[in-house]
Curated annotation (Swiss-Prot):
GO CC annotations, alphabetized: endoplasmic reticulum; endoplasmic reticulum membrane; plasma membrane
Taxonomy, superkingdom: Eukaryota
Name listed for the protein in its UniProt record: Aquaporin NIP2-1
GO molecular function, one term: channel activity
GO BP field: lactate transport; response to hypoxia
SUPFAM superfamilies in the record: Aquaporin-like
Function: Low water transport activity in yeast cells.
Entry remark concerning the domains of this protein: Aquaporins contain two tandem repeats each containing three membrane-spanning domains and a pore-forming loop with the signature motif Asn-Pro-Ala (NPA).
Span(s) of short sequence motif NPA 1: 106-108
Length: 288
């Protein structure tokens, strides 16, 4: 509890409040209160969170992979940029729709949050299970809708909606590691700082996904999500390079979360700009 005292000046017309703020440790973000406040695994609230993850992952994979299928079957009308925009918009919309319950939709994000003590470890298996189920159901739906049955693994006929390297395995691994780490860093930043309002979280995360798909899509497929790669692999039986899309995004997301945890919080960081937006240093004084 803060210590508040009241005193008057000699003239009796000024009141001074002396407030002793709580220690910084009490207000630092992120907190670890999830250990005591997380719902029981069989509670209605936890089941609602799992349903949100299932539905959200389903629509995420359905929309993003449908854009890929339409682009392949209709003379590349969607284009790479269009596909990237679809992925970004669908994740943005889902964050706004389901974020009040749960909006991971990605096993790498779930594991990264757990590794940084921002998510209960005992809920991880259930989350990953429903995320993979949602991705698999979406992939099965797309297979029926677009009749993608003809030798998709070889890419000689129908397009494979899963993830596969365009170049070497090493190139794809490094790319997935980097872009997923960047995505996770953004997720942690916008969800723990007071500078970002809740109204902007979905927009910023969606924009990050769009950016990653634009420059990494032709290299690794820009999966950033093990569930996004597992679902199509299970439905079509194509597992070439699947280890890349299980390991690289997970390690990348964990590294992104740990990097954010090592950085100073907004309360402790030395301000680079003043409240008016002007720099404390002249441009010529900044290191190049």
């Amino acid at each position: 509890m803060d210590d508040i005292s009241v005193s008057k000046s000699n003239h009796g017309n000024v009141v001074v409040l002396n407030i002793k703020a709580s220690s910084l440790a009490d207000t630092s973000l992120p907190s670890n209160k999830h250990e005591s406040s997380s719902p029981p695994l069989l509670s209605v609230h936890f089941l609602q969170k799992l349903l949100a993850e299932l539905v959200g992952t389903y629509y995420l994979i359905f929309a993003g992979c449908a854009a890929i299928a339409v682009n392949a079957q209709h003379n590349h009308v969607v284009t790479l940029v269009g596909i990237a925009v679809v992925w970004g918009i669908v994740i943005m919309v889902l964050v706004y729709c389901l974020g009040h319950l749960s909006a991971h939709f990605n096993p790498a994000v779930t594991l990264a949050l757990a590794s940084s003590q921002r998510f209960p470890l005992n809920q991880v298996p259930a989350y990953i299970t429903v995320q993979v189920i949602g991705s698999t159901l979406a992939s099965a739906t797309l297979r029926l809708l677009f009749d993608l049955n003809n030798d998709v693994c070889s890419k000689k006929h129908d397009v494979f909606l899963g993830s596969s390297p365009s170049g070497s395995d090493l190139q794809a691994f490094v790319m997935e590691f980097i872009i997923t780490g960047f995505l996770m860093l953004v997720v942690c930043a916008v969800t723990t700082t007071k500078r970002t309002t809740e109204e902007l979280e979905g927009l910023i995360i969606g924009a990050t996904v769009t950016l990653n798909v634009i420059f990494a899509g032709e290299v690794s497929g820009a999966s950033m999500n093990p569930a996004r790669s597992i679902g199509p692999a299970l439905v079509w039986g194509c597992y070439k390079g699947i280890w890349i899309y299980l390991l690289a995004p997970t390690l990348g997301a964990v590294s992104g979360a740990l990097i954010h945890k090592m950085l100073p919080s907004i309360q402790n960081a030395e301000p680079e700009f003043s409240k008016t937006g002007s720099s404390h240093k002249r441009v010529t004084d900044l290191p190049l």
